[in-house]
UniProtKB/Swiss-Prot annotation:
This is Extended FMRFamide-12. GO terms for cellular component: extracellular region. It comes from the Eukaryota. It is found in: Secreted. Its main location: secreted. One of its GO terms (biological process) is neuropeptide signaling pathway. Belongs to the FARP (FMRF amide related peptide) family. Keywords: Neuropeptide, Secreted. It comes from Austrophasma rawsonvillense. FMRFamides and FMRFamide-like peptides are neuropeptides.
Length: 15
């Protein structure tokens, strides 16, 4: 699931 989480991001890249 796409989540805006810093620890757990599947479809989001950690900036």
């Amino acid at each position: 699931s796409p989540t805006l989480d810093d620890e757990h991001n599947d479809n989001f890249v950690r900036l």
